[in-house]
Amino acid sequence: MILSDKTILKMLAEKTLIIEPLEKEQIQPASVDIRLGNTFSIVEDSCTGIINLEKEVKYKTITSDTYILLPNQFVLATTMEYFELPNNLTAFVEGRSSLGRLGLFIQNAGWVDPGFKGEITLELFNANRCAIELKAGRRVGQLVFAKMDDTALNPYKGKYQGQKGATGSRVFLDYEVK
């Protein structure tokens, strides 16, 4: 069941859902607007030009209130907000249609697990022929919350728990199911 603004406000007041900082204008009928933070990360150039998924990838991190996203460029960014989801709530990240119509895509996994704590890393791609100026504080998407039928048996405790800033891939820490 997708949560209404009324339920979101109730959970925030009870502190069973934490979103900080949060302005009341961010709360929509069935979602919460998320804003762009001021941390951006790009993959550092590799001498081979190949990313090996078994090894840690190095990132260049930039802290700035403005970032110029070039045409066909990919950058990691972060939300301004920090989240703490209870163990019976999950969330979906959706990009804003108004920005998508300009060629700015939020290409993230789109899923926030129950029990997650941290800022959400956003994967941004500029599909436009023109550069796009990104500014910290701008609304870039929505978080849609869904209540689960029961509390998660194993809430999120993964490799991105507690992340702050534009956090690079930690795929090299994965173990594959055989």
Swiss-Prot record:
Note whether Glycosyltransferase occurs among the keywords: no
* Gene name in the database record: dcd
Pfam family of the protein (one): DCD
Any GO BP: dUTP biosynthetic process
Q: What is its EC class?
A: hydrolase
Keyword Nucleotide-binding listed? The answer is yes
Q: What is its EC number?
A: 3.5.4.30
The record ties this protein, via Gene3D superfamilies, to: 2.70.40.10
Q: What does this protein do?
A: Bifunctional enzyme that catalyzes both the deamination of dCTP to dUTP and the hydrolysis of dUTP to dUMP without releasing the toxic dUTP intermediate.
Please state which protein family the record places this protein in.
Belongs to the dCTP deaminase family.
- Which species is the source of this protein? Acetivibrio thermocellus (strain ATCC 27405 / DSM 1237 / JCM 9322 / NBRC 103400 / NCIMB 10682 / NRRL B-4536 / VPI 7372)
| Protein name (record) | dCTP deaminase, dUMP-forming
* Record field: catalytic activity: dCTP + 2 H2O = dUMP + NH4(+) + diphosphate
